[in-house]
A protein has these predicted regions:
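C-terminal output/interaction extensions
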Residues: 122-129
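Conserved binding/recognition cores within well-folded domains
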Residues: 1-112
Length: 129
C-alpha cells in the first residue's frame, strides 16, 4: 500500500514527455506525443505509430518499459508486454474469452492485439475514467 502511494506521488510530480525524437533517413524529427496512437515492441525493437497526415511507423530508441514511464498514464495504457496504446488508437473492443479483450487498432496490421489477463480490469477502469 505504501509503495503504491509513493509511486502515485512520484508520478504526479513527474513531467511526461511531450515529444519523441526519431531519425528519418539522415534527418532528425521531433514527433509530438499527441500524434502517437500506440507503441509496440517486436523482436526487441520498439516502434511508434502516428496518426498524423501520413500515418507512419517510426523506430524509437526506448524500451516499452521506458516509454511507459515517460508517457502520461491518463493518455496511454500498457495492455501487454508488446503494446502501449492511446484511447484514440482503439477502433473496436471485443470480448475474446471470459477474461481477455481483443482490440482493433487504427493503422495496425496485427489483428490479434490482446489485453493481457492481468490488465483487463485496470484497462476497463482506464477506459471509464
Amino acid at each position: 500500500m505504501m509503495s503504491q502511494i509513493q509511486r502515485a506521488i512520484s508520478t504526479m510530480s513527474q513531467p511526461y514527455k511531450h515529444r519523441f525524437v526519431v531519425k528519418v533517413g539522415e534527418h532528425i524529427r521531433p514527433i509530438p506525443v499527441a500524434e502517437v496512437l500506440y507503441f509496440t515492441s517486436q523482436e526487441k525493437v520498439t516502434f511508434m505509430q502516428t496518426h498524423a497526415d501520413q500515418a507512419r511507423r517510426f523506430i524509437i530508441d526506448y524500451s516499452l518499459d521506458q516509454v511507459e514511464a515517460a508517457v502520461d498514464p491518463n493518455r496511454f495504457f500498457r495492455i501487454s508486454r508488446q503494446y502501449i496504446v492511446s484511447l484514440e488508437a482503439v477502433k473496436d473492443i471485443v470480448a475474446y474469452s471470459s477474461s481477455r479483450l481483443k482490440l482493433t487498432l487504427k493503422h495496425c496490421e496485427d489483428n490479434q492485439v490482446l489485453v493481457s489477463r492481468e490488465r483487463v480490469g485496470s484497462f476497463r477502469q482506464w477506459l471509464d475514467q
